[in-house]
Design a protein with these regions (language model features):
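Glycine-enriched, solvent-exposed interface loops adjoining structured elements
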Residues: 1-231
Length: 231
């Protein structure tokens, strides 16, 4: 659906579930509701808060639902990490698109007298990191993968970096696969609160997800209407 069609679908569905109210949402408010619904939809499909607690790639439908936001190679090129005090850092702000959720990562590893090989990154909880670094059976290795976790970027505390703990390995480029932030839908005809504006922007998620997002927007709107402070 185009953004215009999503607005129409929203109005029709809202009228069915909230027919007792004569209140109406304006264009800017419907845009906001659709974008809020999009955020909820993405988090559910990624696995953060879906009721079945299933992850992103558990079912083909979840993979399809977020396929247009899932960034992989070659769209996302390898990034050369910086090395400080034996730890490699990859600022997520250096990715091609605005990062939202991590899905998978790998890194080029150089071993003496062997050709460069690409190994999977292996996430380690911060609480377990110290023990893992001291444990020879749990450290980064060419058989078990390379340890990493997330933290504040060293160059900008408002952003996040991936920190990689190579052990005795020498690392090259890092390859991150991730869910990017979606474009914000915008119907047009108005100006944002900050004075900015943009051209008409349709939803970039797959077509088959649009009706579900409108349903979610109607659910959010219904909750607003039913709230005692709504006038």
């Amino acid at each position: 659906m185009t953004i215009s069609e999503m607005h129409y679908d929203f109005k029709v569905k809202l009228d069915k579930v909230a027919s007792q109210t004569k209140e109406d949402f304006n264009v800017a408010e419907i845009d906001w509701l659709l974008n809020e619904a999009q955020d909820v939809f993405i988090k559910q499909r990624y696995g953060l808060n879906n009721p079945h607690r299933t992850g992103f790639e558990v079912t083909q439908k979840r993979i399809d639902d977020l396929s247009s936001l899932h960034v992989k190679q070659p769209e996302q090129v390898g990034i050369t990490p910086t090395l400080t005090s034996g730890v490699y850092e990859v600022p997520l702000s250096s990715l091609t698109h605005t990062y939202l959720f991590y899905t998978r990562g790998s890194v080029d590893v150089t071993v003496t007298n062997c050709p460069t090989t690409t190994m999977q990154l292996r996430h380690i909880q911060a609480d377990d990191l110290s023990d893992a670094l001291r444990d020879p059976f749990n450290q980064s290795s060419i058989t078990d993968g390379v340890l990493f976790n997330f933290g504040k970027s060293s160059g900008n505390l408002a952003t996040t970096s991936i920190y990689i703990y190579p052990g005795t390995l020498t690392l090259g480029d890092v390859y991150i696969e991730y869910i990017k932030h979606p474009r914000q839908m915008f119907f047009g005809t108005y100006t944002y609160i900050d004075g900015s504006t943009t051209t008409l922007t349709n939803c970039e998620l797959p077509e088959h997800t649009h009706s579900e997002m409108v349903d979610q927007a109607v659910l959010i709107a219904s909750g607003i209407i039913e709230h005692p402070t709504y006038q």
